[in-house]
């Protein structure tokens, strides 16, 4: 195989390669076996025409296109490997020469990764808007939230206030016509929770049990039911009950109700503090890592990022997200219906920061290459086991789905991130 690669820009070039006679013969054999099944010729049963007769009747050239399709993927991959390039998109392939008895010559217009010039990526000084410190107020807030979760709702005769729960019947209409989904019975609604259309809950503050009021609201312009978006509606609402939260006393007994592993309120506070310290420490480390990576990317120079890489990243991110939804039993159609969005909306959402994600990945890959990381079989095995645990899949299935080269690449990327983050200093 003769191979050459000529760059036409930093990210584009022409790959020229040939397919030798032995490979062509293999392709022609595959092509003949595929097409002969549909050929009927007098003197032969359907599909039983001989190769000699086929060549005499149609010419061997009739098999060229099918033969090329059979051998091209392997030939192209071999040419890419020999040229030592990394295409990032499907190539545009043209046949330069395809004659009987000669090697076939082809060209491929390919898009490759851009040249990356690394700047500083170790010992970076970064600023983060995060802290590991846990305050007494944060512990008290956690305790108050737990106390609220165990509060009882007690019927009250006085007027409803923010934070109270009202049990209501309601019938909604637009221009005097009731609409689907606008009716409810014995619905519990916490005032101030923002569960209902903006303006609805505020108009129930001050109402009492047994009262019927007319609540006038306007549906948001981006409301998921398009036929209601931006329209004024009237809800005839009857308040059946008003309930107020009755908080339990903060004592050792409540502490045991909140967490059966503790015996006293002080033990519960200590446990909450430890959990907050762990979560804030993790958030702090994440913030440092993010800031350090952003600094390393800013210090690097990338001449241009091919549009093809941006498009590929958008589709990858979309497929990953929608695939995750499907694992939860939510189809793409269902997701778009629930959220009132479309595939185009999701595409725009991921397109907004696709350039940043691609740029970041390219720099991290370049750092991994600069550090010449090696990956042991034990590390690959540990990565497979970790992924199997994350996705609740058998180890054997993960091994089949993910090539070793891909796993080694991911491990090297993690090592590069670790180098960037662990050497960073916080200002």
UniProtKB/Swiss-Prot annotation:
PPIase FKBP-type domain boundaries: 163-248
Compartment(s) where it occurs, according to its Swiss-Prot or TrEMBL record: Cytoplasm
GO molecular function: peptidyl-prolyl cis-trans isomerase activity; protein folding chaperone; ribosome binding
Keyword field: Cell cycle, Cell division, Chaperone, Cytoplasm, Isomerase, Rotamase
Keyword Isomerase attached: yes
NCBIfam families given in the database record: tig
Domain remarks in the Swiss-Prot or TrEMBL record: Consists of 3 domains; the N-terminus binds the ribosome, the middle domain has PPIase activity, while the C-terminus has intrinsic chaperone activity on its own.
Protein name from the UniProt record: Trigger factor
Annotated source species: Lactococcus lactis subsp. cremoris (strain SK11)
